[in-house]
Each structure stands twice: as C-alpha cells, then as structure tokens.
Amino acid sequence: ATPSNTVYPGNPNGYESPETTHYSVVDQWGNAVSVTTTINLSYGNGCIVEGAGFFLNNEMDDFSAKPGVPNAFGLIGNEANAIAPGTRPLSSMTPTIVMKDNKPFLVVGSPGGSTIITTTMQTILNVINFEMDIKEAVCAPRFHSQWLPDVIQIEPRGLSQDVLSNLRLRGHKIIYRGGYIGESNGIMITSEGLFGGGDCRGETSAIGY
C-alpha cells in the first residue's frame, strides 16, 4: 500500500489503479487471508464523503436495475437480482482460499469485474490440473465467457489456432478482448515454504519478509 504521507495532489495514474484491488497474504504462522475490495467503477458513484476524502461506491450497478438489460460489465440479470430492501447484489468478487489436508494450499484472487470468476478458476486449475507453479499460473493466457453475451473472449495470445478452429466448428463465436483479462495474484503454500506469484499483465508483484 502507498503510505498516505507520500500521496500529494497531481496525476494519480502513477500510484493508483482505476480498478478493483485484490491482495493475498500469508503470515509466518500460516494464517491466510484473501481480500478483494472495490468501489465498482472508476470513481464509484462520483460522490466524495465531505471531510473524509473518499469516494462512495456504485455497487448498486451489481443489481439488475432493469431485468434483461446489461449492466456496465455486460452482465444481464433478471428479477431474482432486482433491487429490493434487505437484499444484496450478486458480485463477481471471488477472494479464494483452497484447502488441502485441512490446511491452506492456495490463496488467490483478481480484479476484473465479470472476468474475476473465470480468472480465479483458471489460476486454480493451472496449479492443480496443469501442475504449474503459482507464477506460471497467474501469468498464463486466459479466456472468458459469461453466458450472455454468448461469446468467448480471449486475449491476443489466449488460445492456439487449432483450439480456436475447433471452437468455431462447434458454433462458438470468438472475439479478441482489448487489453488483458484479470490481473491475478496468489500464494502457494507447500512443505518447502511460501511461493508468491504476481500477474505479468499489470503492476501486481509478490513480496515477502
């Protein structure tokens, strides 16, 4: 985190990302936390709390304000996720701790709006099914599908041409996503110690002391 006494008025792009934040932490005793925090869209709802200096979120967009109409992330909801008293909206945030033998094995998560779920799932599968180390797992190419719109989004280097051809033969529509999908980070806990991985796509990094 950036110490508050080093933040001054000016161009915030040098020290602050416009997207959701995720961090994974494990301490010397093996306690693990996976935290995803967000104000949803850039600048939240655009209102600053007077005297406090922070933006209010616009997480109301995670509700289906108008069933059948996509929200800011292209997700199409229905009446089950409608705005109503005493309810909470659906969220794509997926801070995750994977257990193995009743102990934390993976601590992972990502920013990325509606791509968070697929990003986190692919990171976990990369470790468990494809036996990657955590750095390889968070940096590997990714794809995303959220049912509606019914397309498969891929990064420019996301899938091989033979896989793309087979998907198209099965009737899938493939589109190239501008930019990257997610920005995962994670920690793998083994008998040999802790191994951290920061996604190559952005400013994510792994540190330990």
What does each model-identified segment do?
Residues 113-121, 134:
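Short, charged, low-complexity patches
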Residues 40-42, 112-113:
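A short acidic/small-residue loop/turn micro-motif
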Residues 44-45, 65-66, 116-118, 162-163:
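Extracytoplasmic/secreted cell-surface and envelope-processing proteins
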Residues 42-55, 118-122:
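A short, polar/charged loop-to-alpha-helix boundary motif
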Residues 1-17, 29, 62, 82-92, ...:
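C-terminal catalytic domains of large/alpha subunits in multi-subunit enzymes
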Residues 1-38, 51-52, 59, 66-70, ...:
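Internal maturation/activation junctions in enzymes
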Residues 54-82, 96, 104-105, 115, ...:
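Signal/transit-peptide handling
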Residues 50-53, 74, 123-126, 154-157:
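Short, charged/polar low-complexity linear motifs in solvent-exposed/disordered segments
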